[in-house]
Design a protein with these regions (language model features):
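Extracellular "leader-to-stem" segments immediately downstream of a signal peptide or signal-anchor
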Residues: 1-96, 106
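Short, solvent-exposed beta-strand edge segments and adjacent coil->beta transition regions
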Residues: 69-71, 156, 180
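Acidic glycine-/aspartate-rich tracts in secreted/extracellular proteins
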Residues: 78, 102-104, 124-125
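Extracellular beta-strand-rich solenoid/capping regions of secreted or surface-exposed proteins
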Residues: 86-93, 104-118, 127-144, 150-164, ...
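Right-handed parallel beta-helix
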Residues: 116, 121-122, 139-150, 164-179, ...
């Protein structure tokens, strides 16, 4: 006669496996998530474009950039003015910035990027030269698929992140030949990812900076 074995699952079916933890919720921008009729604005026209946000990794993986903002198209390679990258980056509202032109933008001063911006260079070859990008006390910025090279002047970096900036993602960018450094992250800035980017180091004051 067979043995009887007692156990927690002998008289009833085993409990279902535990549910996986919910993914972290992206923090909303100050203006809210901008929904109309239960759907996110622009969802039907640029869903694949904005899917970039879901591929972020590392400490900056919660960066949402301009996810909940309008699509803004750069149509000019001028340093400033209508249709320029600088005009888009200084806007107060969240924006997902794309390019309708390829070429070189000669920056005569640092290009300051405000919070909740995505600079998305995919599909074009966009080169920034002369100066670099400055992220000062800003939050939720994504920079993707840009070339930054040939920055000249004292304290000129390809990308400066300071002070107290958070949730920044720099992805698939090429940086080379800046008089100071390529990417400078300082002064309590945190939650930042630099991924899949090419950095060509150049000497500065007997040291190398990346």
């Amino acid at each position: 006669m067979g043995s009887r074995v007692s156990g927690p699952y002998m008289d009833s079916p085993p409990p279902p496996p535990p549910r996986p933890p919910s993914p972290p919720r992206h923090p909303p921008h100050p203006q809210g998530e901008r929904h109309v009729g239960g759907e996110m604005l622009y969802q039907d026209t640029d869903h694949r474009l904005r899917a970039l946000v879901g591929s972020a990794e590392g400490f900056g993986r919660h960066a949402i950039g301009g996810l909940y903002g309008a699509i803004h198209r750069v149509t000019s390679l001028q340093d400033d003015g209508p249709g320029s990258l600088r005009e888009a980056c200084r806007a107060e509202e969240p924006l997902w910035i794309v390019f309708e032109v390829s070429g070189t933008i000669h920056l005569h001063s640092y290009l300051r990027v405000s919070s909740y911006k995505t600079i998305d260079g995919r599909g074009q070859r966009v080169v920034l030269t002369g100066k670099g990008l400055r992220l000062k006390s800003c939050h939720h910025v994504i920079i993707c698929n840009l070339v930054l090279e040939g920055g000249r002047g004292h304290d000129v970096d390809g990308i400066q992140v300071k002070p107290d900036s958070t949730n920044i993602w720099i992805d698939r960018c090429t940086l080379a030949d800046y008089d100071d450094g390529l990417i400078d992250i300082t002064r309590q800035s945190t939650d930042i990812t630099v991924s899949r980017s090419f950095h060509s180091s150049f000497p500065c004051k007997s040291y190398y900076y990346i």
